[in-house]
């Protein structure tokens, strides 16, 4: 399978696992969604459904790294970089319309199988937010708490938006991120805020 073809199938797998969860997605359902026969699925993913989910998490981990964590390392003021990170999450979760597959995979029997990958993403994300805030002059303890607050807000607002069928909840939180980042920042030059 070419890299482009594999990415296309992994994108389809993302949709299947988002909609059905890991435990709920059957090989028949995956076969139908990807257009690959069961034999082809096992040829490309010899480890079966577990390998498919690991591939999905690798794919999403790279996407999240490239589109969220990298924005924190980019150009602009601290609030602007956090705003860009929020915009990336808006895109990934389609404005709050799509659930977080990382949260889905932690439900049911799949948790033990994929905990390491999920832990790695969340740890990398929290560490990068903390690093940026510390470099801006915030003390480590406050920066860690602020990073956790932002991550909890993003994930929590997404779950609430899904549970209430109201994506505006997620959008409002994303829009509030720059203000939340500014709270607790030192008295740096106003031009740098």
For the regions a protein language model found, what residue spans apply to each?
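Amphipathic alpha-helical segments used for helix-helix packing
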Residues: 93-113
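Hydrophobic alpha-helical segments that form the core
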Residues: 141-160, 172, 176
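Amphipathic alpha-helical packing segments from all-alpha helical-bundle domains
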Residues: 65, 111-136, 145, 175-182
